[in-house]
């Protein structure tokens, strides 16, 4: 068993390339990864990255085949084993993000994994791995300043708008979209002394709710063109599967305005028709244009990144031990399962003989079962310890030999054995606790 991943991100690809790959892969994801021998999979998709995680055998070559099939060999990165685990911890910690330290990625990792778990694609191994990633992401933000004063994609868009226009003071801003990203934009722009923040959303009530929170004004979504005529900057961040601002919309608006119009599209898929950039008097920026903010952000946080990496390496060692224990557990279960099956048969036979000869009560059977279970635990205690040691030393041939000798371990596992095997198992919950929601 090994874990591996293939990733394409903002480091090597533009947003539209990532989007195109996702739209190509999404409807046939299982077909794409079918060339790999795997037991579990999960994926992460955001505006800046698309990653597939697999648990299986001989993953490196098949992940390379996937990259070749998708035409991303030169842009994709492939990680297997320890490097894959480290990569996921880095992603959840925010140090692989375009905006270093941004907090949104932690929720995205959790959300993507939960979808895969609910769909039955992710199992125990990935649950432990992603659970650890979420734990590490929380710890990093609690113990370091990596997210202190950090900017999200939303607030980076506001910063870019401020740079392009010189100031946002006294300007009119139109925000299209009142979801998670739109909320981040709204919070960032509310403190910039703008003259007005107009918020448009397909569900008008959501626009009203967000407007009340920041002191903005909710406007009707079907009247976008009217507001394009009067606003200085438009930031669009919906989750629509198609463009919500067309070239025709902007052309009609520009006929009735004399000043330049700045439009920033931070949605994925894109909210604004790309050809809008060709219009006179219009400047269209996208997520790719936020890279310079990312570079400045990285320079400011270099010292904190070193602290984060220290935490990641510490937690990585714990995760590796946990996964090794999981690999040993099947072999341990096989030993106990076979022993219990035979002992159970022998106890029944012995009780029948004692009952026939001495007329013993049912209480005697309970005593015999207690004795048998105690004998099993004592007899297999040392082999159990040795198997765990073998796993931690990467001596997996020992584990495979035990599984071959004792079978697949599908029999019932007793409570006594279960407590032994599961001892020290950490409680990992990928989902946000009620206290955090």
Curated annotation (Swiss-Prot):
Write the protein's name: Glutamyl-tRNA reductase
Active-site residues, record numbering mapped to chain? 47
**CDD domains according to UniProt:** NAD_bind_Glutamyl_tRNA_reduct (cd05213)
Amino-acid positions noted as binding NADP(+) in the UniProt annotation, renumbered to this chain: 177-182
Q: Which InterPro entries match?
A: 4pyrrol_synth_GluRdtase, 4pyrrol_synth_GluRdtase_dimer, 4pyrrol_synth_GluRdtase_N, GluRdtase_CS, GluRdtase_dimer_dom_sf, GluRdtase_N_sf, NAD(P)-bd_dom_sf, Shikm_DH/Glu-tRNA_Rdtase
Please report which protein family the annotation says this sequence is part of: Belongs to the glutamyl-tRNA reductase family.
Job description of the protein = Catalyzes the NADPH-dependent reduction of glutamyl-tRNA(Glu) to glutamate 1-semialdehyde (GSA).
Per the UniProt record, the source organism is Archaeoglobus fulgidus (strain ATCC 49558 / DSM 4304 / JCM 9628 / NBRC 100126 / VC-16)
Query: Could you tell me which NCBIfam families the record lists for this protein?
Result: hemA
Region listing for Disordered, in residue ranges:
410-437
Q: Which GO terms describe its biological process?
A: protoporphyrinogen IX biosynthetic process from glutamate
Q: What is stated about domains?
A: Possesses an unusual extended V-shaped dimeric structure with each monomer consisting of three distinct domains arranged along a curved 'spinal' alpha-helix. The N-terminal catalytic domain specifically recognizes the glutamate moiety of the substrate. The second domain is the NADPH-binding domain, and the third C-terminal domain is responsible for dimerization.
Q: What would be one Pfam family of this protein?
A: GlutR_dimer
| Catalyzed reactions | (S)-4-amino-5-oxopentanoate + tRNA(Glu) + NADP(+) = L-glutamyl-tRNA(Glu) + NADPH + H(+)
Q: Which domain of life is it from?
A: Archaea
